Swiss-Prot record:
Gene name tied to this protein: leuA
Protein name per Swiss-Prot or TrEMBL: 2-isopropylmalate synthase
Metal-binding found in the keyword field: yes
EC id: 2.3.3.13
Region annotated Regulatory domain, chain positions: 390-512
Amino acid sequence: MKKIQFFDTTLRDGEQTPGVNFDVKEKIQIALQLEKLGIDVIEAGFPISSPGDFECVKAIAKAIKHCSVTGLARCVEGDIDRAEEALKDAVSPQIHIFLATSDVHMEYKLKMSRAEVLASIKHHISYARQKFEVVQFSPEDATRSDRAFLIEAVQTAIDAGATVINIPDTVGYTNPTEFGQLFQDLRREIKQFDDIIFASHCHDDLGMATANALAAIENGARRVEGTINGIGERAGNTALEEVAVALHIRKDFYQAETNIVLNQFKNSSDLISRLSGMPVPRNKAVIGGNAYAHESGIHQDGVLKNPDTYEIITPALVGVDKNSLPLGKLSGKHAFQTRMEEMGYNLSEQELKDAFKRFKQLADAKKEVTEDDLHALILGQSSESADDFELKHLQVQYVTGGVQGAIVRIAERDGTLIEDAATGSGSIEAIYNTINRLMKQNIELTNYHIQAITAGQDAQAEVHVVIKDKSGAEFHGIGIDFDVLTASAKAYLQASAKSKTGSKQADFEEVK
């Protein structure tokens, strides 16, 4: 039975999703959960792209102990050197180098001839091989590349020392039949095919990312690249949870095994959904809210008699456990810590102390503390502790003629208090206009989403906003509070703080 490696690029390609920007603490938290999930390789970022991304890759490389960490690099010596520096503390470092091979990319983006591309691949793969034991090469836009030239580029990379060849469907152009044939062609033409790990990197523009990834596995790929929940640029990437469960459920067909701990998918999905601000669609395969719901009477009757009639995946398989022990105001610190670890959170002693204090306050205010409340509690603590600004006071009042006024007081990181007031056509607009004055910013609100974390009158509100600055960069903010207006203010303030620090990495050419 063949072994399939899982390569997660949530922290690199997933973060290219408009409005998604993880800070260092969030990235480490995600990486630790991916390690617990059993991911073989974590792509931590693009070290050369910005000082912030370099520090993130460096921190993740130091934190991860049981899987490989890799960084992205162009065919540029400076990129490779920077990646080496960022990954020097990794237990098992790898590097991921890319260069486009399609005619449209070579002519209009790279402005390089085929000969120049081949020479660059040869030189830079050889250069990287002197620094890394595992070197992955990706011919960007492979599925739109001339087949003969693609094979020549791949052979050049292997001859120069590449140990992994990744085939990206950069724009989601291919289909399972064509993609499978591409791997068959590589198997036939590349003399070292069985000695090299071949991988797929698929995008979902035509809705076939998972199917294409599985077609690659059927035809010789031994590594699959993707993200949790399928997040990523445009329509997203291959959803790793779908591939992993498909390989498990249809082991009879694929004859493959993995290192994935399937019951960690729900925790992984929840964590990334909340930190990215991207809700999982209810009809999403494997981990969606309706994945195990049955509306039809005939289906319900069948499931009650025997779940196998209509369920091929049990909820418990992917970690959907509706019978978990509830926590309440009488729960102790040990029980709280255990639940946090089960949910994928690895808290320091001080973080645990602060979180438990907030939990006790929450338990006093609510009849029942649900798992969603606990996710929100940690998320709120993480976002607030990472901000340079803290909401200290909010007052909203009716002015005249339907106009609302807002007074907002903010504490800066050094403790300085700043306060201002403004009006708007509604309470939210008044609050946001006031924050704009305080932050001296000119930004556009592009998305505002509010949801109740749980049912009931004592539910907390969770607000997600996306703002766009004058350069076009987008930033995501989260706010959680029992009061909707306070949650809205916290979310907008957090997004504004991110735009001030420019936490979104620079816009670089990437394997998409």
